[in-house]
Amino acid sequence: MKRILAIAFLFAFCFAVSAQQNFSAANAETKAQHDQRMRWWREARFGMFIHWGLYAVPAGEYNGKRSDRIGEWIMEWANIPRADYEKFALQFNPVSFNAKEWVRIAKEAGMKYIVITSKHHDGFAMYGSRVSKYDIVDATPYHRDPIKELAAEAKKQGLVFCFYYSILDWHYPAAYVDAPGKDPTAGNRTTKLKPGGKEEYLKYMKEQLRELVKGYDPGVLWFDGEWQDWWTEEDGKALYAYVRSLKPSIIINNRVGRGREGMKGLSKTDQTYAGDFGTPEQQIPPSGLPGVDWESCMTMNTTWGFKFYDDKWKSAEVITRNLIDIASKGGNYLLNVGPTAQGLIPAPSVERLAAVGAWMKMNGESIYGTTASPFASQLAFGRATSKPGKVYLHVFDWPGDGKLNVPAFGKDVKRAYFLTHPKTALTFHQVDPGGSLTLGLPSQALDPIATVVVLETK
């Protein structure tokens, strides 16, 4: 027994050392190289998240029961047996899916990249996988690869195509759910792996990731489901290195490893963790994260995967101001849609994205390629973003007296104007060099969501 334990310990130690060495090699890039790899993503600021899978079939209801929990977790919260859940594949026939239309909706909303679920926690692959028949091509009457169509269309329309991939897998044969029958509302049940199952599953996962990276050329791999106790930071570093070996320029989120703190999605700082950016979920860091790349992923209602009865929609104003708020703090906004089992993006999502797109068409310059607000604290009247030589003031609360008081930010202002009317100068008064200033504004805001004032600096 002692000999067996010693061998097991030696194997684990060697794996950890190898993982660290591979991670270090994959991460051996200069700051300039890292900045170049991250450049397009940092400039994009706005992307579409798509949660689409078998869970769209029950759409939040199983055996007449509904839940306020998220739709893509229905297999877990409804305690659906694996064999019964598999039957949803026979009903999954998204004949209304139109890749050109989906990408058009994203592009016209002002989004620059798309992240879609290639495999969520339920283990069902939304592409044609050679290592599993539990996919949309082989297991459904649809028999098409919508991911391939979407990737081609995204490239055609100029958007960067990206993948979500779940480390957690409720379907894989070597996995099983701890404490079956436990009340799901009491907390997420833990997925375990059978003896020897980890090595088997890692091989399977890496083969699927190779298919995705080599077959679809994604710009980002967005991992999730890393919280299981069998997944370690060493595993995360090894997987990060593996994916970067397949495509050195790819960007990978921090959920590949164990470096996030709950739903804050931020990288811990007690050691070097795997991943290129943090992932706050359903929240915006109050003061941003200076010096850290991050992306807030958020829903338009209360679910990621489609639920037919979830009508708690955020307004277009809230969504647009979220985008502005996130950009003002130096982050990206990954906004979710949950398509139906028929392959349609819900109408309320389409309507809101069109409204955001209308604002972005006029004001996108104040979002794309910007950096965080230059002000020491959050502005009372709205938010701000910046570029070399320019500061963009996003005015949410219009001053009733026609005077906008702007705090000092260490720069001399030489000109002020509305972004939508660049040839018409606004009056302003700046008492001291680099000091606070007062802008003269008309009685009514130009835009009810956010009027953008540009300050050109010396």
Where on the chain are the PLM-derived regions?
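Positively charged n-region of N-terminal signal peptides that target proteins for export
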Residues: M1-I4, A106
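Bacterial N-terminal signal peptides
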Residues: A6-A16
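Mature catalytic domains of secreted/periplasmic carbohydrate-active enzymes
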Residues: Q20-K458
